[in-house]
Amino acid sequence: MALTLASLTLGAPTTAIPLWPGAAPGEKGGLPPEADTIKPTDNLVGGRTVAKIGNVSTPTLAFYPAPKDTATGTTVLVCPGGGYYILALDLEGTEVCTWLNSIGVDAVLLKYRVPRRAGREPSAAPLEDAQRAIGIIRQHATEWGVNPGRLGVLGFSAGGNLCAILSASAGRDYPRVDAADDYSFHPDFQLLIYPAYLVKEGGGTTVLPESAVTPATPPTFLVMAADDPIDATNVLAYGQALKQAKVPMELHVYPSGGHGYGLRPTKDEVTTWPARAADWLRARGLLTAP
């Protein structure tokens, strides 16, 4: 029997389910089959390879429930990075869901559409997928044991950019499909880990309009390394905008570590960020069951 939203039950993790009842908005087909595009020459991270999933035309979500005896009632939608070309689905996805479960947080892994669609903004299709995913989670909050008022997002690199754009969006970017689209898609908090594209590439110092910060932006946790080739100005400018808007935020810029480390430990202090993130969640009361 095919798995549907109605038949989804708690597991560790559940089987991935499609976000859309038919084709996703604007999809024209023609992509090769979805596949891991990893190459033998790719760099290792923390001594291990990184999955690089490409050609995603059927976006999905997979629910990773925290153990019942430690569950806090907090849920996080995880958005992997990959420049909007691929998804680092283990490094910045499944491994992150496992960590969130270890601190009592339910995780939902978003596999959004990549690569960039011709004739559209790089984030356009992924944003539709993220908006849809949040609506689905809130629609099924009771069935899945989710507190709809304690639902955040966590994104890496392009996934961090996606989270920021999601938080800034005024309305849905696609016509209503069903009841899931009647629920708010705005997250209650966000964690942006080495986010990309928040400022203009090549020297921008102010947050781009699509990621604009307002007093309605949710409380934010930011991490980056000073030697990140993406440029730490992304988090510095975003952090300053949060401060000016009086949005609660915590910003960590570490001396070294580069880009794309996920939460795998390395010699660089930046990879201790999960402990800082857990402290931040705890301080906000999100690691204590209501």
Describe the role of every protein-language-model region:
Residues 229-236:
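Conserved alpha/beta-hydrolase "acid-adjacent" motif
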Residues 222-224:
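Short beta-strand/loop motif that positions the catalytic acidic residue
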Residues 12-71:
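N-terminal cap/lid segment of alpha/beta-hydrolase-fold proteins
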Residues 236-239, 243-290:
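C-terminal catalytic histidine-bearing segment of alpha/beta-hydrolase fold enzymes
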Residues 72-81:
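Short beta-strand element of the alpha/beta-hydrolase
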Residues 87-90, 95-96, 110-145, 264-270:
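Catalytic nucleophile-loop/oxyanion-hole region of alpha/beta-hydrolase
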Residues 80-85, 226:
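Active-site glycine-rich loops that stabilize anionic/oxyanionic intermediates
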